[in-house]
């Protein structure tokens, strides 16, 4: 996981039961409505018990027909940081009148449990390696705060063009914030999702 080895993921994926694979994805709200009141695109997971075996490797490494939004990715990472409990996203902290008095305040709300605390802790430990010595270490090692997360690269054509992802959270022993960043055509711009996420984390801890 730390080195984002596609061959390892694909090999493991070939041992999975396709029906169980789909049900696990749907437990994480793929093909489902998100507990969010705003506008969003639903994430899609196409593998089923009837899918051909050659569809598995591409899906396991995050390619193929799987689609996920930054919002959904951040929600899953938030659940990992929160011992498996999914939180309902909200975009407005409070509403004030013209005198500056708060007339309505919004608060975090739980939206269910999507994994056990043990499963969340295992994933957290794996993702620490990404930022300590793996694919994200060039961005997140040696900081005054610790980041746990996962890098990702999504090719979208046959010419090598790709989007760069990073999703993670800070200070895993007592989590602060989750950041999900995606940069389009990162192979052209040279700007990665991890670089963008680092700027957000730095801004948060510099305040």
Where are these regions (language model features)?
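Beta-lactam-recognizing serine transpeptidase/beta-lactamase-like catalytic domain environment
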Residues: 1-184
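Conserved active-site neighborhood of the chymotrypsin/trypsin-like protease fold
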Residues: 6-8, 189, 194
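Short amphipathic alpha-helical face segments that pack within enzyme cores
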Residues: 69-75, 192-199
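Short, gly/Ser/Thr-rich active-site loops of penicillin-recognizing serine hydrolases
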Residues: 102-104, 194-207
């Amino acid at each position: 996981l730390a080195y984002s080895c596609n061959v390892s993921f694909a090999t493991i994926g070939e041992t999975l039961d396709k029906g169980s694979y789909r049900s696990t994805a749907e437990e994480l709200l793929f093909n489902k409505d998100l507990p969010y009141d705003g506008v969003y695109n639903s994430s899609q997971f196409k593998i089923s018990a009837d899918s051909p075996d050659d569809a598995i490797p591409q899906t396991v490494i995050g390619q193929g027909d799987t689609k996920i939004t930054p919002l959904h990715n951040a929600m899953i990472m938030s659940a990992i940081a929160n011992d498996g409990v999914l939180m309902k996203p909200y975009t407005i902290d409070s509403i004030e009148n013209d005198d500056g008095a708060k007339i309505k305040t919004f608060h975090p709300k739980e939206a269910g449990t999507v994994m056990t605390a043990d499963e969340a802790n295992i994933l957290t430990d794996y993702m620490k390696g990404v930022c300590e010595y793996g694919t994200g270490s060039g961005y997140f090692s040696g900081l005054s705060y610790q980041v746990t997360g996962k890098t990702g690269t999504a090719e979208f054509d046959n010419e090598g063009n790709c989007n760069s992802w990073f999703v993670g959270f800070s200070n895993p022993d007592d989590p602060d914030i989750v950041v999900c960043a995606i940069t389009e055509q990162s192979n052209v711009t040279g700007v990665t999702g991890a670089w963008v996420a680092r700027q957000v984390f730095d801004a948060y801890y510099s305040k």
